[in-house]
Amino acid sequence: MRKDKLKDQYRINEEIRSEEVRVVGNNVEQRIYPISEALRMAGELELDLIEISPTAVPPVCKIFDYQKFIFQQKKHQKEQKVKLSKIVVKEIRFGPQTDEHDYSFKLKHAKSFLEEGNKVKAYVFFRGRSILFKEQGEILLLRFANDLEDYGKVEQLPILEGKKMIITLAPKKVEIISRRLKR
């Protein structure tokens, strides 16, 4: 049986250590109460006194059904998890003397990656003495970024790292949303 972290996060009823608490809830006047009166009010309503913000002075407590409260918190956390999108980085490799057809083919793929909402990391790989053509590689990557200007924005300009010259492009947010709605 796994332990529920969410239940350990909140103190309820007699676990609350403060002498005074600010009470909020649907059926309660919002103000500061002594802990004994707040517990009595929760008992009369057959609900729990839940410490929501223990760091506040005085701590904020809510009169609510504890099981329902935990359920709502879990539901809220799941919704937040769904909203977080995983960032996927697609890589495209060029050589320093990439032909026009190869370039257009890779450009087409990069456009589709950016439309899907993925980042694109394009790099020119220099082998042996081809490192002498690093200016050509930089020109190629800048042209690549310029051709993808409508689909994404440059996140990192071309940098030489070892035998690779790398550029990173991120999708434009507004463009992604409008393209997804069209489908």
Swiss-Prot record:
Similarity annotation: Belongs to the IF-3 family.
A Gene Ontology BP annotation from the UniProt entry: ribosome disassembly
Oligomer and partners: Monomer.
UniProt keyword list: Cytoplasm, Initiation factor, Protein biosynthesis
Gene source species: Azobacteroides pseudotrichonymphae genomovar. CFP2
Localization (cell): Cytoplasm
InterPro entries the UniProt entry points to: T_IF-3_C_sf (IPR036788), T_IF-3_N_sf (IPR036787), Translation_initiation_fac_3 (IPR001288), Translation_initiation_fac_3_C (IPR019815), Translation_initiation_fac_3_N (IPR019814)
One annotated Gene Ontology cellular component of this protein: cytosol
Single annotated GO MF: translation initiation factor activity
Keyword match Oxidoreductase: no
The keyword Cytoplasm belongs to this UniProt entry's keyword annotation: yes
Transmembrane segments: none
Top-level taxon in the UniProt lineage: Bacteria
Role according to the record: IF-3 binds to the 30S ribosomal subunit and shifts the equilibrium between 70S ribosomes and their 50S and 30S subunits in favor of the free subunits, thus enhancing the availability of 30S subunits on which protein synthesis initiation begins.
Protein name: Translation initiation factor IF-3
Pfam families reported for this sequence: IF3_C (PF00707), IF3_N (PF05198)
